[in-house]
Amino acid sequence: MHGKFDLGMDIGSVSVNLVAMNPRGEVLREVYVRHLGETYRTALNLLESLGEEFPLDSCRLAAFTGLGGKALAESLGGAFVNEVIAQARGTYHFQPQVRTIIDMGGEDAKLILVGEEAGHLVIQDFAMNTMCAAGTGSFLDQQANRLGYPIEEFSELALKSTTPPRIAG
């Protein structure tokens, strides 16, 4: 039996990601599911599945982020957190020495520069791609699928390339 927990959910353009953590900040459950355009249904299914293992009335707080995070937060009574802030805080929690965060999302790519002042996280700067989605995760996912590779294997192959192409920018 599990005690109290905190819930975080990222509803993106390609996937829904969920994490449940105990009050000490230890990850109890982590899930990544491609939603195939069914963002709301996928998110609710994940919450229902989580409820089978963790009583949802034991949830101390729920925070939502990403493209579909605001609507879900409003409908479920949770908090909405801007994804740049969520990524910076999450990275700082698990890897406080990190100063550069690169997020390759389904619709955009972000570069987030973070620092620390007086023992607190500071977002120093961030930038997003201004070009088409060719340099983002959904494009890479589509190309992997076209070539018959799972995206996880596709990225491993890319790291072995001796002449990587410039995709966008």
Model-predicted regions and their roles:
Residues 1-83:
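N-terminal glycine/serine-rich phosphate-binding loop of ATP-dependent small-molecule kinases
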Residues 1-2, 68-115, 119:
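Conserved phosphate-binding catalytic cores of ATP/NTP-utilizing and phosphoryl-transfer enzymes
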Residues 5-7, 25-26, 60-62, 78-79, ...:
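Structural motif
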Residues 6, 10, 64-66, 103-104, ...:
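Short glycine/serine/threonine-biased micro-segments
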Residues 15-18, 106-112, 136:
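Short glycine/serine/threonine-rich phosphate/pyrophosphate-binding segments
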Residues 32-38, 84-90, 129-133:
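Short, acidic/turn-prone active-site loops that include or flank metal/cofactor-
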Residues 42-45, 49, 71, 90-93, ...:
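Alpha-helical scaffold segments in soluble metabolic enzymes
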Residues 116, 122-163, 168:
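Glycine-rich phosphate-binding loop plus the immediately following alpha-helix
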